[in-house]
């Protein structure tokens, strides 16, 4: 399988402060094939301006999804000052903004994986369904509330409605990031930066090399928009009849299947997964089109089931769609090690292994012409080495989550949220020693990681 693939490296991004010729044909420079209007200037020089230093912190976590919250909570519990920058008004990333509602590949993991599972179960906000009996399905609002509580308990600072606009790079180090929010452009200074954006936005802005998509054509796995439906009055749901109804009506779900996740404590409410939305998650035009297509497809399916799925479905309605698209794949930042499918085939373990992965390679077909649905490739359990989390091109930058260093197929296995949490925990521990990530003594790091994952964290809410 690996022999059929050829990896291609994407061009480096332009680091902050690099001089470039003006005008710049920006679309052409990025390899965009869209035609350009010759009457429109090809580039503009943004005026220089004074940017205030708004904050200073030990650890800056960019992105508050599963990897980001794990990094932040772990670093704070180790005594560091931590700030999370998050574009949404809540934490959780794909758990909440993406409305995933299921914890994947957490069942064999301790640490924060275990803590979050137990705390959701204790408040009746997690349940188990027959489709994946080892993976808890959780309530969206319950997850938001739990993460808010953990922020208060750990003392982590959070700034919502904020995106990273640029980085300040000096040689092989980043001194901080420029942010954009309703407060305007600001600067945050930090000793260590953890890129938990999912898309590797910070690393790309710092000029780190990355790979995007599968070898050859660079296409990425499709995105998914979830819909939350209510009004069902029957018993256990069998999804095959729902798929048959859609196919017979000529409304083939783009996902190739229909999946329903029952919401804990909400009778008759389900999360509907039925969409595959194709495009580049780094292109705002593709994101816009995918959002609109996803909403239209979900509305059509819900209307179809209300009219044709029987009396238990006659009052079904669409409550809402996910606040944000669930993105499966975008940049993979090159680190100090590049995890390959050959290493997965061998069930490779590493001296600096920070996460043991048991999940399959879950490859959703990147091109609709290849048919809807997905391909599963099974591997023996393997390790993610700590070096995959350290940016190759910047000394004080780490990645956690799906943007770490690995090939297209390996990525399809380790991208799930249970592994993202484990990566976040590991990324945070270097701060305890006050040194760059690559200078950490590996055996000591692994010993601390193992101790942390087997120690119960006590708080008033537990």
What do the predicted segments below correspond to?
Residues 17-19, 27, 31-59:
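Extreme N-terminal leader/targeting segments of oxidoreductases
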Residues 59-80:
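N-terminal Rossmann-like FAD-binding beta1-loop-alpha1 element of flavoenzymes
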Residues 57, 67, 96, 186:
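Ligand-binding pocket scaffold of soluble enzyme catalytic domains
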Residues 168-187:
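Conserved beta-strand-loop-beta-strand element in the redox core of flavoprotein oxidoreductases
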Residues 3-29:
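Ser/Thr-rich, low-complexity intrinsically disordered segments
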